Amino acid sequence: MSYIVIEGTTVRFLTTTPFTAFNGTVVNPDVVTFSYEVQGQNPVTYTWTNPTGDPTNTIVNNATGYFYADIDTGGGAGVWSWRWASEASTGIDTTGTTVACEGSITVSPSGVV
């Protein structure tokens, strides 16, 4: 999905479908990452690790298999590309998911001075 928001808006990026194991069971993977990149800038990545979570509290696990991150768009006018992904890190994690969802938003500078 692609949206246009005004710079300075806090945007909630969320997984719209859950992370699932190969057998279809909804699971929390061992490691979940949320990454975004504003055109022309370095990518920013946050990591959530099961069971300790995200030390920055940016990624929130709000239900089994579902996650969200609230990101302030201040100072970031341009096209943002974002991605939710996971990597199996133990034999217990059978998700095998590499990308759960991805998309882009356009952050428009505010016209108010």
For every predicted segment, state its role.
Residues M1-V113:
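Polar, enzyme-active/binding microenvironments
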